[in-house]
Amino acid sequence: MSSKMIVLMSSDGQSFEVEEAVAIQSQTIAHMVEDDCVADGIPLANVESKILVKVIEYCKKHHVDEANPISEEDLNNWDEKFMDLEQSTIFELILAANYLNIKSLLDLTCQTVADMIKGKTPEEIRSTFNIENDFTPEEEEAVRKENQWAFE
């Protein structure tokens, strides 16, 4: 039995044929399918092809059914390897997951960033994310006092 296919079109003009059952992990796409708006393909104006490829890879792996069984542990291990990406790609995936409304991918990408921050000082976080400190020493001290609970 062949699956129904739909075409996703990236913002840079590339088309990807994907099983509908895989694509509807995106609530955005699921609503378009429900509204019967997929005949000519689905343009995804906010997602470039290099990111759409990663989103599709994620959705294919997370499309679990009788034909594609996978244990929770194997899926978690796969997710960990999947997120071994450059920072810029992780941030682009966050934007795509949010735009496409794929909660599990949004949770995974945001948790990855949270793990990059956890246990670090403000200086280490700035270094990790290449953020310039534009506070004066006085402003920084005021913020520390205001949020002292966070530094305990």
Swiss-Prot record:
It holds the Pfam family Skp1. InterPro entries: SKP1 (IPR016897), SKP1-like (IPR001232), SKP1-like_dim_sf (IPR036296), SKP1/BTB/POZ_sf (IPR011333), Skp1_comp_dimer (IPR016072), Skp1_comp_POZ (IPR016073). SUPFAM superfamilies: POZ domain, Skp1 dimerisation domain-like. GO terms for cellular component: nucleus; SCF ubiquitin ligase complex. Its main location: nucleus. Expressed in young seedlings, cotyledons, roots, leaves, floral stems, inflorescences, pollen, and siliques, with a slightly higher level in inflorescence than in other tissues. Residues 94-152 are annotated as: Interaction with the F-box domain of F-box proteins. It is found in: Nucleus. One of its GO terms (biological process) is ubiquitin-dependent protein catabolic process. Keywords: Nucleus, Ubl conjugation pathway. Pathway: Protein modification; protein ubiquitination. Involved in ubiquitination and subsequent proteasomal degradation of target proteins. Together with CUL1, RBX1 and a F-box protein, it forms a SCF E3 ubiquitin ligase complex. The functional specificity of this complex depends on the type of F-box protein. In the SCF complex, it serves as an adapter that links the F-box protein to CUL1. Plays a role during early flowers reproductive development. Belongs to the SKP1 family. Part of a SCF (SKP1-cullin-F-box) protein ligase complex. Interacts with ADO3/FKF1, COI1/FBL2, EBF1/FBL6, PP2A13, PP2B10, UFO, SKIP2, SKIP15, SKIP16, SKIP32, CPR1/CPR30, At1g55000, At1g67340, At1g78100, At3g04660, At3g16740, At3g61590, At4g38940 and At5g49610. This is SKP1-like protein 11. It comes from Arabidopsis thaliana (Mouse-ear cress). The gene is ASK11.
